[in-house]
UniProtKB/Swiss-Prot annotation:
Entry similarity comment: Belongs to the universal ribosomal protein uL29 family.
MF terms in GO: structural constituent of ribosome
Keyword Ribonucleoprotein: yes
Keywords: Ribonucleoprotein, Ribosomal protein
Lineage of the organism: Bacteria, Pseudomonadati, Thermodesulfobacteriota, Desulfovibrionia, Desulfovibrionales
GO biological process, one term: translation
Name by which UniProt lists this protein: Large ribosomal subunit protein uL29
Entry's Gene Ontology cellular component terms: cytosolic large ribosomal subunit
Length: 61
């Protein structure tokens, strides 16, 4: 999801999306540690998504 799409969401929706992304990152890290993660490039992408969401939440105040 890009920044323009995220900016259209409300603060509550962003918080839900943030929780979902953090859970996804946790699961990916676990699968990576047990050598079950196929696309390791998704790890940094998810981190960037979390950073984007946090930035937009700060902008909204």
């Amino acid at each position: 999801m890009n920044a323009a799409e995220l900016r259209k969401l409300s603060a509550e929706q962003l918080k839900d999306k943030l929780a979902e992304s953090r859970k996804e990152l946790f699961d990916m890290r676990f699968r990576h540690a047990t050598a079950q993660l196929e696309k390791t490039s998704n790890l940094p992408a998810t981190k960037r998504d979390i950073a984007r969401i946090l930035t937009i939440l700060k902008e909204k105040g």
